[in-house]
Amino acid sequence: MKVHIFTYGCQMNENDSEIVKQLLKDEGIELTDDENDADVVILNTCAVRKKSEEKVYSHIGKLRKKGKKIGIMGCVAEKEKENLFKRGVSFVIGTRALTKVPDAVLNAKNGNKQIYLEDTLDEIEYHKVETRSSNHHAWVTIIHGCDRFCTYCIVPYTRGREKSRPIDEVLKEVESLSQRGYKEFTFLGQNVDAYGKDLRDGTSLAKLLKLASQIDNVKRLWFLTSYPTDFSLEIPKVMLESEKVARSIHLPVQHGSDKILKAMNRRYTRQEYIDLINEIRKIVPDASISSDIIVGFPGENDEDFEATVELVKLLKFERLNLAVYSPREGTVAWKYLKDDVPYQVKVRRMSYLLNLQKTINKELNKSYLGKEVEVIVEAQAKNGLFYGRDIRNKIISFEANPESIGKNVIVKVNKISAGPLYGEIKKILD
């Protein structure tokens, strides 16, 4: 029996798929990269946006026509549960029941519908996961779930409450991977700054970054995603202490209006967010700060939108992820707040912010022209150029060869844009 896994959504889903592939391999189950060659296709799904969920249902329909056995894991599995059986799905795996996938696959041939929603995360031996999507970079999930319950967000309902992995276990995984040649690590969590709080033993993200940076062969450490009221100023201090900790912080603000922030249940004010960014920049002046903003949340008027525009102009984010609000069934906003901003208005406002951010990006990127920076070569793009990121998460494209992937190189930037930078390799460091 051959199995194919298709992954939608976030980096944590990528990591979950890597773990499941290892679990299947350990049971002697064959994996295939070709969906058409598979007997069983597992979709690791995303439900953050309605569009993401619709893509999953479309994919299920195509797989049914091909006669495939279908397994669903990820957030859609947790959200829809038994309802997925009506769509012809063979088994459903909850976000914390990853270890049940091999049993589900082996039992799929008998035609019985299966659903596993229990928490078996403690059974996973993370340090033994060898099936990674990269040969030099590894996703490392350090905390599952979220306790913040923003009114628009489905994640607390699909990923559960916050649950941290013991710090020794995480460090063991990083150590094991570093011995196998991995040099770059991204610590993952829906609210990564909450890491360790539930353990009540002094564990924190700052402590983890400090200890992981002391491991031989580790070259760079990243973390995603931060929440403003949980973010500790110890983290930028660790950035100053270790050149291995990337000077990049993704800190979603979601909106610039206090009225909308309150309706979102974001637990901070506009000014508190501004003060936090200013404090971070006092400690690490060249810190790269990116953010997320939702456009068209219920009740957003012109004044609210203008507050967001002014915030973006003031803080000058390095990157900005924009999304048009769409109600998610089961959330507080879906239940109690009318989706009253016309779609055309949402699109117009998002377009305005996109153009504003492009202008900011181009202005910020000017400081890179003629500069030499160290990057780790990641991969080759469709245009034939290779690319990598510097310590501030700036993407730089350049000519190289496949043998350079995973290597540290010095690149001189000779061209800028509102997006990636362009340059040439001046020196290979390893």
UniProtKB/Swiss-Prot annotation:
Residues 366-427 form the TRAM domain. Pfam families: Radical_SAM, TRAM, UPF0004. The keyword Nucleotidyltransferase does not apply. GO terms for molecular function: 4 iron, 4 sulfur cluster binding; metal ion binding; N6-isopentenyladenosine methylthiotransferase activity. It is an enzyme of class 2 (transferase). Belongs to the methylthiotransferase family. MiaB subfamily. GO terms for cellular component: cytosol. Residues 1-110 form the MTTase N-terminal domain. [4Fe-4S] cluster 2 binds at residues 146, 150, 153. Catalyzes the methylthiolation of N6-(dimethylallyl)adenosine (i(6)A), leading to the formation of 2-methylthio-N6-(dimethylallyl)adenosine (ms(2)i(6)A) at position 37 in tRNAs that read codons beginning with uridine. The gene is miaB. It catalyses: N(6)-dimethylallyladenosine(37) in tRNA + (sulfur carrier)-SH + AH2 + 2 S-adenosyl-L-methionine = 2-methylsulfanyl-N(6)-dimethylallyladenosine(37) in tRNA + (sulfur carrier)-H + 5'-deoxyadenosine + L-methionine + A + S-adenosyl-L-homocysteine + 2 H(+). Its cofactor is [4Fe-4S] cluster. Keywords: 4Fe-4S, Cytoplasm, Iron, Iron-sulfur, Metal-binding, S-adenosyl-L-methionine, Transferase, tRNA processing. The keyword ATP-binding does not apply. It is found in: Cytoplasm. Its EC number is 2.8.4.3. Binds 2 [4Fe-4S] clusters. One cluster is coordinated with 3 cysteines and an exchangeable S-adenosyl-L-methionine. Residues 132-363 form the Radical SAM core domain. This is tRNA-2-methylthio-N(6)-dimethylallyladenosine synthase. InterPro entries: Elp3/MiaA/NifB-like_rSAM, Methylthiotransferase, Methylthiotransferase_CS, Methylthiotransferase_N, Methylthiotransferase_N_sf, MiaB_methiolase, rSAM, rSAM_horseshoe. Monomer. [4Fe-4S] cluster 1 binds at residues 10, 46, 75.
